[in-house]
């Protein structure tokens, strides 16, 4: 049989079989049930709760994840690309992200701006353009807000130090003010802001008039011999900043037009051990990490990541967390922690939880009432931790 004959025989058989099937009783197609069209929607959150925290994904993820420390659950994500800085609206309405990008990824026209995200649906509300910003991630105090949430301050260095002032109500850039030789910002109600300086002083930048005015305290630390960690903590109720040096000296400053800086004390001596020093080849307990301490203002407790090492081991992960009572200058508790955490935070609610994170992106949550681990979150993030401001 030729190929043409075989081909004709095959198609004839197939046609006959199809006709028999279609002609058989009950072979009609079953009616298709009507399907209701799916309605798309957007999940909505509650405004941020005091038990919530955000942890940056670092170089691994381009977002900060929102978790509830009380339940250990993931709430959502806020877009925070690499080398961005995050700030939370004190009223809980918005998340602000200070960002930089180029029109052609790593080249082209540079754009610096602050993105405004709604805290309930996490939708982008606006981008506020500004002249520039310092591209250093992992800092709590490069982008800060005024106590009323109406003004934003973004640190810049191009090449001189300066601050971009933003009107967050009108959502516009206002002006750039010079801040020579200083960095790490803290907002000062009724004045403007303060910053740590390379000469060991605390600068106060008055922004009330048309012209800014800078005053400086007397030097109180050595930026060369015993620097202060830039991720310091702030007690908004007392208008006080709490600082920590590489050797473990604790400083407090009451903020204002003329800040008052108290004499420092040794964190190690507060725990009953020898004070930290800059002497070489001396092993002792030292603070370290990227985000070295966390403050719970309502109780006056400071939590510090500590490790055994030598001076200048200030980036090492911790083996213990020390709880310091700022009123008595005493370490009231020492807690062993796993994972060599390099970041620490504490929620600002009445029943606070302690949060630690290490380079392996494992987050541990502790119930401070019992001191026990409440949750372990794998692959949750390893960057800076930001907690919801105290109500």
Please give the residue ranges for each predicted region.
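Solenoidal tandem-repeat scaffolds enriched in leucines and small polar residues
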Residues: 168-262
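Repeated scaffold domains used in trafficking and secretory/extracellular systems
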Residues: 38-44, 80-91, 135-144, 179-190, ...
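Short glycine/acidic-enriched loop and turn motifs that connect beta-strands
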Residues: 58-61, 101-106, 159-160, 200-202, ...
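Short coil/turn segments that connect the beta-strands within blades of beta-propeller domains
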Residues: 49-52, 91-93, 148-150, 190-192, ...
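Short, conserved, GDST-rich strand-edge loop motifs in beta-rich repeat architectures
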Residues: 43-55, 98-111, 304-318
């Amino acid at each position: 049989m030729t190929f043409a004959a075989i081909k004709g025989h095959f198609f004839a058989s197939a046609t006959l079989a199809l006709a028999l099937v279609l002609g058989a009783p009950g072979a009609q197609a079953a009616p298709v049930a009507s399907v209701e069209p799916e309605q798309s929607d957007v999940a909505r959150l509650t405004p941020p709760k005091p038990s919530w925290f955000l942890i940056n994904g670092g170089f691994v993820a381009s977002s900060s994840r929102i978790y509830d420390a009380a339940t250990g659950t993931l709430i959502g994500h806020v877009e925070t690309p690499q080398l961005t800085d995050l700030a939370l609206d004190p009223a809980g309405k918005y998340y602000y992200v200070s960002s930089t990008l180029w029109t052609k990824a790593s080249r082209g026209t540079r754009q610096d701006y602050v993105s405004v995200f709604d805290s309930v649906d996490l939708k982008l509300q606006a981008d506020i353009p500004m002249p520039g910003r310092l591209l250093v991630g992992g800092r709590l105090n490069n982008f800060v807000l005024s106590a009323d949430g109406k003004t934003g301050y973004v640190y810049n260095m191009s090449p001189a130090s300066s601050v971009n002032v933003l009107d967050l109500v009108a959502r516009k850039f206002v002006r750039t003010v010079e801040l020579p030789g200083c960095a790490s910002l803290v907002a000062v109600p009724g004045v403007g802001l303060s910053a740590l300086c390379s000469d060991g002083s605390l600068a106060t930048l008055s922004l009330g008039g048309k012209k800014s005015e800078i005053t400086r305290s007397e030097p109180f630390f050595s930026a060369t011999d015993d620097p202060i960690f830039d991720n310091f903590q702030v007690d908004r109720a007392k208008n006080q900043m709490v600082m920590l040096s590489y050797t473990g000296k604790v400083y407090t400053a009451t903020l204002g037009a003329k800040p008052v800086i108290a004499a420092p004390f040794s964190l190690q001596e507060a725990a009953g051990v020898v004070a930290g020093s800059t002497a070489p080849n001396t092993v002792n307990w030292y603070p370290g990490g990227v985000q070295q301490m966390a403050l719970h203002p309502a109780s006056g407790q400071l939590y510090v990541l500590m490790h055994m090492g030598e001076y200048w081991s200030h980036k090492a992960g911790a083996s213990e967390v020390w709880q310091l009572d700022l009123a008595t200058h005493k370490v009231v508790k020492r807690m062993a922690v796993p994972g060599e955490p390099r970041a620490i935070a504490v929620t600002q609610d009445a029943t606070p939880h302690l949060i630690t994170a290490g380079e392996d992106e494992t987050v541990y949550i502790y119930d401070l009432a019992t001191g026990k681990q409440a949750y372990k979150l794998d692959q949750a993030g390893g960057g800076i931790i930001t907690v919801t401001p105290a109500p």
